[in-house]
Amino acid sequence: METLNVDHEDTISSEQEHRAHTKSDTDMPPISGGRDFIRQFAAESKKLWWLAGPAIFTSFCQYSLGAVTQILAGHVNTLALAAVSIQNSVISGFSVGIMLGMGSALATLCGQAYGAGQLEMMGIYLQRSWIILNSCALLLCLFYVFATPLLSLLGQSPEISKAAGKFSLWMIPQLFAYAVNFATAKFLQAQSKVIAMAVIAATVLLQHTLLSWLLMLKLRWGMAGGAVVLNMSWWLIDVTQIVYICGGSSGRAWSGLSWMAFKNLRGFARLSLASAVMVCLEVWYFMALILFAGYLKNPQVSVAALSICMNILGWPIMVAFGFNAAVSVRESNELGAEHPRRAKFLLIVAMITSVSIGIVISVTLIVLRDKYPAMFSDDEEVRVLVKQLTPLLALTIVINNIQPVLSGVAVGAGWQGIVAYVNIGCYYLCGIPIGLVLGYKMELGVKGIWTGMLTGTVVQTSVLLFIIYRTNWKKEASLAEARIKKWGDQSNKREEIDLCEEDENNSNGENNHRK
């Protein structure tokens, strides 16, 4: 019992030291002029890129795992390529949207806890997220098990549905790997352990490429070989990250498994569900764009051209996701440390940087609009349509570089529920109806559908900008402190009370024994 008291006192004193260190790093002073703005901008940019650079690289590497399998499947046969593509985009994509969203709740809590010095609770949050995400994965297994009839219901051919259904069954282990990874990644990002994540992702990608080639093509295992390697690669990322955490890299943020992880799961699940709704409404919105294009008069050309544009859009989105992760970490850290002025300023820095990147990419595409479509298709109709869609693609890239930054702020501040309502109104009550009217009623085809849905994105971005503009950042810092107390301090107090009661019981027992 004495050992427990000593350990607990050490934990409290070390926590106070970290809190004192955090509080000594005071909020930034008001900007006094142009030179001061440039100096503060450069300093904040350095912090953002320190997080965003490795986060972008990690996203590229993990995105490439599925891409490598898909490319090699094309060298097996056409059916294998179709099956892997459908499973990856529809079945797996649906699940990823839900679990990635649920995992973002951890970004809010861990980021704010780290900023406030409540390091011990971060490991508890991680374990709670593991429990909730794996429970969610268990439910999502139904989509994998019944993938064949679901794909047939969506209009896929019997051959593709059957092959994709078989591949989906093989990919169930990856689903649970996602559940572990999405939580672990947020835990590491909150502590700025992004370099380690990048090294792990790059190493796994190299072995994944080699083993996929060996099993799928050289040994002729086909889709089965791809499933084996893809499952193994994702679990290798998970195991390596967990070993890295348990090896002491996270310090007091990881103190081992605890029964505390099973407390207050209902409240944690509510925040996770709000996060999932926010992300899913965004992911499914663009999935609907391709679905609607398949019902146009010339669906082959429309879907082919749109797929090319979506593939191009995917790479800038990886950059935007890196900024999303960096902004959510920095925002939650600063709010947790009660630095409202710095939290507001980093949003300005992230917006300017992200928009600048989007403009450069968009201008490049517009300049090369006569040439780049030939890299993706030999069909003249498809090339012409891609060229016509390039201005919309360029504008979408700029808007999409703004939107993830705003979403990162929302995650960092814990606004997932508010953003979910905004997404429903802007995307599904505004964007999709306008797109359907322009595409079908006014016969503008895929350009009309895309224009309408882009309108929804612009409205959503405008609403988020207005919300952020009207935000009282001092109040948000206070709310972050209250949230940390709700999720952390109360648990620590309960732990202290339990220890004190146990001490008193033991002391009374010893006194009675002496008597």
UniProtKB/Swiss-Prot annotation:
Chain intervals with Low complexity compositional bias: 506-515
Record's keyword terms, sorted: Membrane, Transmembrane, Transmembrane helix, Transport
An example Gene Ontology molecular-function term: antiporter activity
Keyword Membrane: yes
Database matches in Pfam families: MatE (PF01554)
Superkingdom: Eukaryota
Record membrane topology: Multi-pass membrane protein
Basic and acidic residues bias locations: 1-26, 488-497
Cellular localisation: Membrane
Record CDD domains: MATE_eukaryotic (cd13132)
Record-annotated membrane-spanning stretches: 48-68, 90-110, 131-151, 167-187, 194-214, 225-245, 276-296, 303-323, 347-367, 392-412, 418-438, 448-468
InterPro entries, sorted: MATE_euk (IPR045069), MATE_fam (IPR002528)
Cellular component terms per the entry's GO annotation: membrane
GO biological process: xenobiotic detoxification by transmembrane export across the plasma membrane
Spans annotated as Disordered: 1-30, 488-515
Principal place of residence: membrane
NCBIfam families: matE (TIGR00797)
Record-stated family: Belongs to the multi antimicrobial extrusion (MATE) (TC 2.A.66.1) family.
Classification via PANTHER family: MULTIDRUG RESISTANCE PROTEIN
Name of this chain's protein: Protein DETOXIFICATION 32
Origin species: Arabidopsis thaliana (Mouse-ear cress)
Gene transcribed to yield this protein: DTX32
